[in-house]
Amino acid sequence: MKTSAFLTDSTLCIGCKACEVACKEWNEVPPDFTEWRGLSYDNTWALSARTWRHVMFVEGIPEIGKGGNDPATMAWGLLSDVCKHCEVAGCLEACPAGALVRTEFNSVYLQPDVCNGCGYCVVSCPFGVVAKDAVDGRAFKCTFCYDRQKADLTPACAKVCPTQSIQFGELEELRDRAHQRITTLRDRGISDASIYDPLDTSVAGTHAIFIVRGEQKAYNLPPNPEVPTTHLRSAWTSAAVAAGALLVGTLIAFLGAGGRKV
């Protein structure tokens, strides 16, 4: 199985939002409900059922070679967020309708014609990516441009990115490229750059790798994303063990009682 992936490098992002526009245009996604919230200069604010690529503006990244809390040293951290297409996908495991499937590119695809709008995938996503449309009622998320990949084309967002902040390719190749990029950044004096690739977590890695500066959680990248069904499996295992022990205990007590004369 071919494993496609994104590498999104925040140090190259200029905040142009061309990826957002290309995603909406190619996938014919309706306009989102934009509003000024006072939290950022970004009016789309977050990923949603109608925003599958979202360029976030994170305030407070120090300039290269400077530090401290001086406002003159502050700058914007820009990152194009997207569905992570987790190796162990909580949304896929929680869906009772079979609307979410694993494709031949190892991405997670949500079939809108199968979705029943139950919302289990929404609460099962550790990244808050999957969302229900307020008008339609069904869930939607990034498709990884499945139709374009089948035609051997690059996903729309990566195709239009003018700075190569969004790169598309084989997962392992992009992992190597990310580590090479970190080495280059540190050679240039950018010591706070890091790779977000949560391999040793319950999602077992993602097919969207990120390079960010500063705290990763500031970019909606949790340090330990958890798949809810992982805990559910553990609970069922514990319950089965307890039930088995109870059954054995009951059987022993019954046989013991049967051997005594009344």
Show where each model-derived region lies:
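Non-ligating segments of multi-cofactor redox enzymes
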Residues: M1-V262
